[in-house]
Swiss-Prot record:
Entry annotated with the keyword Protein biosynthesis: no
Gene: mukB
Protein name listed in UniProt: Chromosome partition protein MukB
GO BP: cell division; chromosome condensation; chromosome segregation; DNA replication
Main location: cytoplasm
């Protein structure tokens, strides 16, 4: 029996508390005992790290973190290490007794992330005497050691003979070696496998029922049926390969299409260019002839245009000179019209201002009188107001003084003083020194009289002044009129000047009245003069155009001559038009006919090509449509005969294939059901027993056993009897022979041998005579010999079938070609040659075109003569009415005479217009000018003196009145009398004051009224004077401007000036129009000459170039033609229908084909290079070389073994036939490869049944497991309902869903997924692909549901869940599940590792104190029965009598922390105790 591998020890180097510690592991249970923080979990973490060094999985948490998804940042590993290099190694001895040290080098990585670097390694072949700590550390002193780095460790190990050190960069490689050496139970190929293994270790470490494992028990317990899956994958791979082959055939067919496309595009590419060059060569020849003809005609036309240019230049120079004169005249006429219009506006202004001045003069006189009267009233009112003010002031002063005197005792003195002051003031004002209070009243009367006298004198002077003002105004008005008319004149000469002006006035009026008749007469004469000048200019132009000098009297005879010439030319032009129309109609008919034939020619040529191909294919000369239809009927008959023969060959081929399939069965069974029956009966096929018989003995044994040679040899027939009941799935005759399959011989028969036959005595009364078969099939050698013959026959039939298929398809293609020809070309194929008709029509068209060109030249000359004659008649029609005007020679003198008379009349009219109103006003005032009223100023001075005298007299009278009024103040008798007098005086003063104030108020109000009125009158007067002065000045300026203008200001003058301006404008416009016309014609002529010169240069250049091209192309074309004929491709390239396409269409066709060819030859370097070279337009022969290269390339690709032609086109057709045959064969092979749904269902069911039995066997090992109230543990396996339905449908109702499994578009997996979705529409498949779902459905594990159950107390069997069990029960149940998983893994992996390897079994259990003694004993028993190692961690030694126990105590010594370890071997009877292990290494620095 193979011994199971064991873990010997665990070594920790430089871990937290362990500098270099090796734990020897017990063969069953190793217990780590110690208090909290002693290092138990660290020791287990080191073991797990060495076992699974995957940082993505490692997460060491304590039990308080159970179920947590995250712990400390370093996942619990960084904090368990010391700074520097750390190691964790496992010393293992496997089933082969090979010692292997596996472990990891760990090192903290500096940084905030608290990362740890891990490097796995293995050491093989290490001697048993050497401990792991000895090679991992180096002694530097008696009690000090140093940890070696990984390179140093490698050097030390490699220095040992026979020891191998291996470092791993991949965890997968590390685990692969561990699996091969039996360290781990399962091959961990991927991270998912490592995750499963880690979850199992983690579940055992922390105890309990792991949900991560129970949820995915199928993945842990059920092995992957790789054989079945591989069978399915191989089957699908074969189908996929078959379909890929079919797809490759389709690709090959597309390549065939590509080759056809290559030939077609190459033909289009080269033929289009070939025909384009042929067309261009013909076109270049025609173009050279056309260019030469155009060159001669252009030279002739250039000479004509040059002559026209000279003539038009001369005429343009004359028109330009005339235009300059007309522009000058027109500008003068426009200026004259502007002056006349300006003068008319000035005259209107003068008349308007004169009327305004007359009105202003009248208003000014009236306003002057009003202002004078207002001035006098103003002076009177001012005097009265001033006197009233003085009187009021005096009375107020007196009253104030009086009031003051009443208030004080000096009132009298004040009044007396005031009286004296009034007296003094009166004396001074009146100049009377002798004035006293007594004679004041007398003097008052005297001065009242003076005042009255001064007032009367003032009134007299005022009346005289008004009369003088009137006389003075009339004289000034008359004098001003004389000055306005005659200029500055002395006042004494004014009357004489005015009388002379009035005497000349009637003569001036008479001259002014003659202005209008003279203007009309002058306008008429000027118009005739201008008409005469225009007629002379027209006559000069006419003579220049006619080239002769004509007199006016000769014009009528010339007109008759030109009219007769026009009539003749008109008839000639009309006849020429009809003839030209007839030739053009004939030419159009020829062009239409040529176009029709040109459109028909490609169709006819294509029909001829198709007819030629049909003639070549059929070998018959097809001369009419009847022969075509007859040969088509012959093709149909030939096709029918060949098809019948091909079908017979196909039937024979299928029969041979059926024989081959039957003979190819394993064990020589002709019926596959015999193999199943042999397995069912526990027997062996007789053919399998004699499978090694030689080919020489095969006939004998075949005859010996006869029909029973397909029987089954069974050990005991009696055991088979019960299986025969109800047996229906078997052959009609089933032979069962009793015997030992291991030592079977033919002694059971009594045999007599004859020549080529045997007689077999079956029973006493029954014999069987059997001849040797001509083709023996008994034994593998005979079958192989027969199969070889059948293979040869099948190949021969296949070749014959292929030949017949080719003939059928060739006949069908020929028939299709005839059908296409009849449908497309039969209607035109036997018509007359359109190209011959086109050549005849082109000859006739050339003749007509030449005649038409000659006719056009002659017609052009006649039309020019006709146009010149019509133009001459038109000019004569304008000149003949002007002949009399041309003969009038006195017209200019009459115009000059009338012009002088009109100037005098206009001068008189201007004088009357300017001074007529003034003379009219002056005539009644002529007598006033005889006397000058110069005394007017003296009267004004006397009037001012009289006003002053009157004002002084009033003031003197007022002063005397005040003295008289104060006369009582001069004497006061006593105070009482003074008071009485003062009282009276007060009343009087107050009364007078009231009267004086009222008088003053009235005077002020009246003064204000008169002042306002006077101001208004003065303002009006000033405004009138200002307006009068302004208008008078403006009138003078306007009159002066009118004189400066110097043109008459009347309506007729404006009309004449406008008419003159319009006539000149019309003449100028006509001249400009003619000049512009000449300039345009000259520009057109110059442009035509330039274009003709450019055309001549271009024609000469093009002619020389095209001639050179024709010469050069001839040599190149000869080389191309020689190359085409030498290689026999002229028939394919010279496609006459392309001759009817223009160069752009052919170039476009060639370019399109070039683009397609670039894609087609992209993967062929040779053709790509040749194609690139052929793109040179200057080397057309390279395109021929490319076409030849394409044909050569396709010829080289022809398989001469299956294709019997050198023509690539025919080879492509034969290739298509061969591809069709391969497609049929592969389609048949795909049908054979397809697996039935029922077979799939049976395979999956068998696998499920096998795994259910295996789970039952695993359950038997767990029935005796007991933890607390849990008496037993088992695993239930059930088939899911939906998947069971799927299996039933696959096995019994597969016919209903053949649309899925017979689809060529779906693989079997996809069809299975579609069926599952069809049976379970309520399920959501998510975003998964049908292929993925189908692959899952091919995995039997997805059909099963696994569930762990426990038998617990009175509850019976219930589902194992942590919530329903105690902690110890859950730990024990979980451990049982893990043991079952490990066993399952070992069984699953048994075939993957060596047969002499039994892997190590080890699990963990942290915090085992939660289990009672009975549960611990159960664990020990389980480990012993299963040969499993277990590492337990507990605060105390839970079972000191069994296994090995380590007591761990963490101590601190000199600021250094280390773990003190004491080992104890169990002391039970069956296992003697070992002395304590106290040796340990002291930690070094």
């Amino acid at each position: 029996m193979i011994e199971r591998g064991k873990f010997r020890s665990l070594t920790l180097v430089n871990w937290n508390g362990f500098f270099a510690r090796t734990f020897d592991l017990d063969e069953l249970v190793t217990t780590l005992s110690g208090g909290n923080g002693a290092g138990k979990s660290t020791t287990m973490a080191a073991f797990v790290t060495a076992l699974i060094p995957d940082l993505t999985l490692l997460h060491f948490r304590n039990t308080t973190e159970a179920g947590a998804t995250s712990g400390s940042r370093d996942k619990g590993l960084h904090g368990k290490l010391r700074a520097g290099v750390c190691y964790s190694t496992l010393d293992v001895v496997n089933s082969r007794h090979q010692r292997v040290v596996v472990g990891v080098r760990l090192q903290q990585v500096a940084g905030r992330d608290r990362k740890v670097d891990i490097k796995p390694f293995t050491i093989q072949g290490l001697p048993t005497a050497i401990q792991p700590t000895e090679i991992l550390t180096e002694l530097v002193a008696e009690r000090q050691a140093r940890v070696l780095s990984l390179p140093e460790l490698k050097e030390r190990v490699e220095a040992m003979e026979g020891v191998q050190f291996k470092q791993f960069n991949s965890i997968t490689d590390y685990h692969s070696l561990m699996f091969d050496l039996g360290v781990i139970p399962k091959r961990l190929r991927s991270s998912a496998d490592r995750s499963k293994f880690y979850r199992l270790i983690e579940a055992s470490l922390y105890g309990g029922i792991s949900s991560a494992i129970t949820r995915s028990l199928r993945d842990y317990l059920l092995p992957e049926n790789s054989g079945v899956r591989k069978a399915f994958q191989d089957m699908e791979a074969a189908l996929r390969e078959n379909r890929m082959t079919l797809e490759a055939i389709r690709v090959t067919q597309s390549d065939r299409d590509l080759f056809k496309h290559l030939i077609s595009e190459a033909t289009s590419y080269v033929a289009a260019d070939y025909m384009r060059h042929a067309n261009e060569r013909r076109i270049h020849l025609d173009s050279a002839l056309v260019l030469r003809r155009d060159l001669f005609s252009s030279r002739k036309q250039l000479v004509t245009e040059q002559y026209r240019h000279v003539e038009m230049s001369r005429e343009l120079a004359e028109q330009s000179g005339a235009e300059s004169d007309l522009e000058t005249d027109y500008q003068a006429a426009s200026d004259h019209l502007n002056l006349v219009q300006t003068a008319m506006r000035q005259q209107e202004k003068i008349e308007r201002y004169q009327s305004d001045l007359e009105e202003l003069t009248y208003r000014l006189e009236e306003q002057s009188e009003v202002v004078s009267e207002a001035s006098e009233q103003q002076a009177d009112n001012e005097a009265r107001a001033e006197a009233a003010e003085l009187e009021v002031d005096e009375l107020k002063s007196q009253l104030a003084d009086y009031q003051q005197a009443l208030d004080v005792q000096q009132t009298r003195a004040i009044q007396y003083q005031q009286a004296l002051q009034a007296l003094e003031r009166a004396r001074a004002l009146c100049q009377l020194p002798e004035l006293t209070a007594d004679n004041a009243e007398e003097w008052l009367e005297t001065f009242h009289a003076k005042e009255q006298e001064a007032t009367e004198s003032l009134l007299q002077l005022e009346q005289k002044l008004s009369v003088a003002d009137a006389a003075h105004s009339q004289f000034e008005q008359a004098y001003q009129l004389v000055v306005n008319i005659a200029g500055e004149v002395s006042r004494s000469e004014a009357w004489q000047t005015a009388r002379e002006l009035l005497r000349d006035w009637p003569s001036q009026q008479h001259l002014a009245e003659r202005v209008q008749p003279l203007r009309m007469r002058l306008s008429e004469l000027e118009q005739r003069l201008r008409a005469q000048q225009d007629a002379e200019r027209l006559l000069q132009e006419f003579c220049k155009r006619q080239g002769n000098a004509y007199q006016p009297e000769e014009l009528e005879a010339l007109q008759r001559e030109l009219e007769s010439q026009v009539e003749e030319l008109s008839l000639s032009v009309s006849d020429a038009g009809e003839r030209r129309m007839a030739m053009r109609q004939e030419l159009e008919q020829l062009k239409l006919k040529i176009q029709e034939l040109t459109a028909r020619a490609p169709v006819w040529l294509a029909a001829q090509d198709a007819l030629s191909q049909l003639s070549e294919q059929s070998g018959e000369a097809l001369e009419d449509s009847r022969q075509v239809t007859e040969y088509m009927q012959q093709l149909l008959e030939r096709e029918r005969e060949t098809t019948v023969e091909r079908d017979e060959i196909a039937a024979s081929k299928r029969a041979i294939e059926a024989q081959i399939e039957r003979l190819s069965q394993p064990s020589g069974a002709e019926d596959a059901r015999l193999i199943a029956l042999a397995e069912r009966f526990g027997g062996v096929l007789l053919s399998e027993i004699y499978d090694d018989v030689t080919i020489d003995d095969a006939p004998y044994f075949s005859a010996l056993y006869g029909p029973s040679r397909h029987g089954i040899v069974v050990p005991d027939l009696s055991l088979v009897r019960e299986h025969l009941q109800g047996l229906d799935d078997c052959p009609e005759d089933l032979y069962l022979i009793e015997g030992d399959p291991q030592s079977f011989d033919d002694s059971v028969f009594a045999v007599e041998e004859h020549e080529k036959a045997v007689v077999v005595k079956i029973a006493d009364r029954q014999w069987r005579y059997s001849r040797y078969p001509e083709v023996p099939l008994f034994g593998r050698a005979a079958r192989e010999n027969r199969l070889e013959t059948l293979y040869q026959e099948r190949d021969r039939l296949a070749e014959r079938y292929a030949t017949l298929s080719f003939d059928v398809q060739k006949t069908q293609r020929t028939h299709q070609a005839f059908s296409r020809f009849i449908g497309s070309h039969l209607a035109v194929a036997f018509d007359a040659d359109p190209e011959a008709e086109i050549r005849l029509l082109n000859t006739r068209r050339g003749e007509i075109e030449r005649a038409l060109n000659a006719h056009e030249d002659q017609n052009q000359q006649q039309r020019q003569q006709f146009d010149q004659a019509k133009e001459g008649i038109s000019a004569l029609n304008r000149l003949i009415p002007l002949v009399s005007l041309l003969l009038d020679e006195t017209l200019a003198d009459r115009v000059e005479e009338i012009t002088e008379e009109l100037a005098e009349a206009q001068e008189a009219a201007r004088y009357i217009q300017q001074h007529g109103v003034s003379l009219t006003k002056l005539e009644p005032l002529l007598s006033v000018l005889q006397s000058d009223p110069q005394q007017h100023e003296q009267l004004q001075e006397s009037y001012v003196l009289a006003q002053n005298s009157q004002r002084l007299a009033k003031q003197q009278a007022f002063a005397l009145t005040e003295v008289v009024q104060r006369r009582a103040h001069f004497s006061y008798t006593d105070s009482a009398g003074m008071l009485t007098e003062n009282s009276d005086l007060n009343d009087k003063l107050r009364q007078r004051l009231e009267q004086a104030e009222a008088e003053r108020t009235r005077a002020r109000e009246q003064l204000r009224q008169y002042q306002s009125q006077f101001t208004q009158y003065s303002q009006v007067l000033a405004s009138l004077k200002s307006s009068y002065d302004a208008k008078r000045d403006m009138l003078k300026e306007l009159s002066q401007e009118l004189v400066d203008i110097g043109v008459p200001a009347d309506a007729n003058a404006e009309a004449r000036a406008r008419a003159r301006r319009d006539e000149l404008h019309a003449a100028l416009s006509t001249n400009r129009s003619r000049r512009n016309q000449l300039e345009k014609q000259l520009t057109f002529c110059e442009a035509e000459m330039d274009s003709l010169q450019k055309k001549l240069r271009k024609l000469e250049r093009d002619y020389h170039q095209i001639r050179e091209q024709v010469v050069n192309a001839k040599a190149g074309w000869c080389a191309v033609m020689r190359m085409v004929k030498d290689n026999g491709v002229e028939r394919r390239l010279h496609r006459r229908e392309l001759a009817y396409m223009d160069g752009d269409e052919l170039r476009s066709m060639s370019d399109k084909a070039l683009g397609a060819l670039r894609l087609a030859v992209a993967d062929n370097e040779h053709l790509r290079d040749v194609l690139r070279l052929s793109e040179d337009p200057k080397r057309p022969e390279r395109k021929i070389q490319f076409y030849i290269a394409v044909y050569q390339h396709l010829r080289e690709r022809i398989r001469q073994d299956i294709i019997r032609t050198d023509d690539p086109v025919e080879a492509i057709e034969q290739m298509e036939i061969e591809l069709g045959r391969l497609t049929e064969e592969l389609t048949a092979r795909e049908q054979k490869l397809a697996i039935s749904s029922k077979s799939v269902s049976n395979i999956i069911r068998k696998t499920i049944h096998r795994e259910q039995n295996r789970i039952r066997m695993l359950n038997q090992g767990l029935q005796a497991v007991s933890f607390g109230q849990v008496k037993s543990v088992r695993l239930n396996v059930n088939v899911r309902e939906a998947h069971a339905t799927l299996l039933d449908v696959l096995s019994e109702q597969q016919e209903q869903h053949q649309d899925l499994f017979n689809s060529n578009r779906l693989t079997f997996s996809e069809a299975l997924a579609k069926l599952y979705q069809r049976l379970n529409p309520q399920m959501d498949m998510g975003q998964r692909l049908p292929q993925t779902i189908g692959e899952e459905l091919l995995d039997y594990r997805n059909y099963l549901e696994l569930e762990v159950e426990v038998y617990r107390g009175a509850d019976g069997w219930l589902r194992a869940e942590s919530g329903a069990l105690s902690t110890g029960e859950a730990i024990g149940t979980g451990m049982s599940i893990l043991v079952m998983v490990v066993q399952s893994w070992e069984e699953e992996s048994r075939r993957l590792r060596g047969k002499d390897i039994s892997p190590c079994r080890l699990l963990f259990l942290d915090e085992a104190a939660r289990l009672d003694a009975k549960s611990i004993a159960t664990l020990f028993e389980l480990c012993e029965r299963l040969e499993m190692q277990l590492i337990i961690a507990a605060p105390e030694n839970i079972s000191p009598e069994k296994g090995t126990t380590y007591k761990l105590v963490r101590k601190v010594f000199q600021n250094h922390e280390h773990v003190h370890v004491v080992g104890l071997r169990g002391f039970a009877n069956e296992m003697p105790s070992l002395p304590p292990i106290a040796a340990e290494l002291q930690q070094g620095g």
